[in-house]
């Protein structure tokens, strides 16, 4: 599907919520993911239908926000959204399907898990998962479309919290600091300790660490 390139401006007031008042029957959900690039942990996706009667100020691409601001917005989204769902694809699914298809699977699960059935899913990026509702991809949608911004925040905060929890099980890797991304600290820990069960074997740095451990035996 060809991605839609939206002009760099915020959505109009009629579209700030999940309902398009120019088309009264349209219920729009925003969809985004977090965690495609890390070497460890699941990929997480969220779908959000905003309530136009309960607007949320400050929504933006989660990567442009501080952790403190993301946490505050997370609570507001959960409290005020008409519907939301957060879903994931596991490390095993990432390694079996590849990261792109696992991401599409997580997005599909998020949309299908909504308590309100949308008529349109707006997806951040240039690809759409296979859905039973209409879908459109919006390049840079997480910075442009409020419901996608909200989804990006839910996905990012949820995944970061999951990796902090994984740090309790696997403290040598520093997941609480880098949340699985390929930092010098993480790569050094991989070389020293080898991968653990939540590392993605399909990612090159993890395979290289496995080969290094095998060669040292």
UniProtKB/Swiss-Prot annotation:
Job description of the protein: Endonuclease that specifically degrades the RNA of RNA-DNA hybrids.
Pfam families per UniProt: RNase_HII (PF01351)
Source organism (scientific name): Burkholderia ambifaria (strain MC40-6)
Name this polypeptide is given: Ribonuclease HII
Essential cofactor(s): Mn(2+); Mg(2+)
Assigned EC number: 3.1.26.4
GO cellular component term, pick one: cytoplasm
Keywords in alphabetical order: Cytoplasm, Endonuclease, Hydrolase, Manganese, Metal-binding, Nuclease
Subcellular location: Cytoplasm
Family classification: Belongs to the RNase HII family.
InterPro entries (alphabetical): RNase_HII (IPR022898), RNase_HII/HIII (IPR001352), RNase_HII/HIII_dom (IPR024567), RNaseH-like_sf (IPR012337), RNaseH_sf (IPR036397)
Transit peptide is among the record's keywords: no
Residues reported to bind a divalent metal cation: 32-33, 124
Keyword Nuclease: yes
